[in-house]
Structure formats: structure tokens, C-alpha cells
């Protein structure tokens, strides 16, 4: 595969991570550059790791991925989005959220990288070498996640608490989109 093809694949896979990073950037107060770096490392790392797991697992997990992965991604994103909305409505009145703990980052990273696992499986079936695509996918996702978190912070800074509700709705909407695509509704 050419560099351009791998780069475009990385962009496509990074869109969910970008949206979730932007949503996270809107809600975390106080926001630090280290928060954006944490998001970028988790999302970039998982987007790079999952194709490798798919490539190694190949056909052994292909049925599971195609049948259940969209449901898992939907469940994780709906749960996290619902939690964000609940916290915005009933949580800390100062609106300070620290949703970037490691367990939350892990769940978000898994939810946004399940499609990369399927890409790894397709690489295995096609006999595609894995190293170059994985490096490019991970780097593109790292940069997009970092930029998404910073952009989210800039936007969220103006809207304060209401943005956490919007962030939760974005995560739920992303989960619904993943599920709708799987069910061929869109």
C-alpha cells in the first residue's frame, strides 16, 4: 500500500478518536496540555495496536468482530455519553470534570479503535505488510486526537457546563452511527 493510501486510511480511522477527543477537551477543567497528550497517546496507541491484533488474530476473530464489535462500541460510547450527561445535570456544580482517568481513557480508546481491529483482519487476509500502515495510523490518530482535544477545550471554554451535555450527546450519536452502519440503516 502506498503512503497516501495508508495516510487516508489513518484519517478515516482517526475520525472517531478526533470526535471523542474534542468532546473530552470540552469538558475537562482545568485543562492542561498533558490531558491532550494523554488522549493522543491512548487513542494513537490503540489505533496502532488494534490492527496488529487483528492481523495476528486473522480469521480466528473475524466472525466476532463483524458480528459484535459495533454493539460493543455502541454500548461503551452510550454508557460514557450517558455518564457525561448525568454528571452535567447532577454532578459538580462548578462543572469541573476529570473524566481523563485511565479506566475512562481505556474504554474510550477501545470503543474508537474497534474498526481498526477489523482493518488488521483485512490486512491479514490480503497479505498486506503491517508495519508501515500501523505506524502511519498511530501517528495520524495521535495528531488528530491532540488537535481535537485542544480544539474542544477552546470551544468548551466559552460554553462551560452545557458543553458536557453536548459532548455526551456526541458520544451517544457516534455509537448510534456505528450501530446504524452495521445494521445497514445508513
From Swiss-Prot:
Q: What is this protein called?
A: Putative manganese efflux pump MntP
Membrane topology is: Multi-pass membrane protein
Which protein family is named in the record? Belongs to the MntP (TC 9.B.29) family.
Keywords, comma-separated and alphabetical: Cell membrane, Ion transport, Manganese, Membrane, Transmembrane, Transmembrane helix, Transport
User: InterPro entries this protein is in?
Assistant: Mntp/YtaF (IPR003810), Put_MntP (IPR022929)
Q: Which residues cross the membrane?
A: 1-21, 41-61, 62-82, 105-127, 139-159, 163-183
One GO cellular component term: plasma membrane
Identify the domain of life: Archaea
Main location (coarse class) = membrane
Q: What does this protein do?
A: Probably functions as a manganese efflux pump.
One Pfam family of this protein, by short name? Answer: Mntp
Query: Which cell locations does it reside in?
Result: Cell membrane
- One GO MF term, please? manganese ion transmembrane transporter activity
Amino acid at each position: 500500500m502506498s503512503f497516501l493510501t495508508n495516510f487516508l486510511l489513518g484519517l478515516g480511522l482517526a475520525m472517531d478518536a478526533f470526535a471523542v477527543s474534542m468532546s473530552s477537551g470540552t469538558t475537562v477543567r482545568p485543562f492542561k496540555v498533558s490531558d491532550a497528550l494523554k488522549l493522543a497517546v491512548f487513542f494513537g496507541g490503540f489505533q496502532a495496536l488494534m490492527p496488529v491484533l487483528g492481523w495476528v488474530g486473522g480469521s480466528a476473530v473475524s466472525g466476532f468482530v463483524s458480528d459484535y464489535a459495533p454493539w460493543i462500541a455502541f454500548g461503551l460510547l452510550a454508557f460514557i455519553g450517558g455518564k457525561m450527561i448525568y454528571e452535567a445535570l447532577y454532578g459538580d456544580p462548578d462543572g469541573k470534570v476529570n473524566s481523563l482517568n485511565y479506566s475512562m481513557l481505556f474504554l474510550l480508546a477501545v470503543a474508537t479503535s474497534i474498526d481498526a481491529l477489523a482493518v488488521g483482519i483485512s490486512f491479514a487476509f490480503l497479505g498486506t505488510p503491517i508495519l508501515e500502515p500501523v505506524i502511519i495510523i498511530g501517528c495520524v490518530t495521535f495528531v488528530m486526537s491532540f488537535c481535537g482535544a485542544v480544539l474542544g477545550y477552546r470551544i468548551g471554554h466559552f460554553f462551560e457546563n452545557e458543553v458536557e451535555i453536548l459532548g455526551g450527546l456526541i458520544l451517544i450519536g457516534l455509537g448510534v452511527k456505528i450501530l446504524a452502519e452495521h445494521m445497514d440503516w445508513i
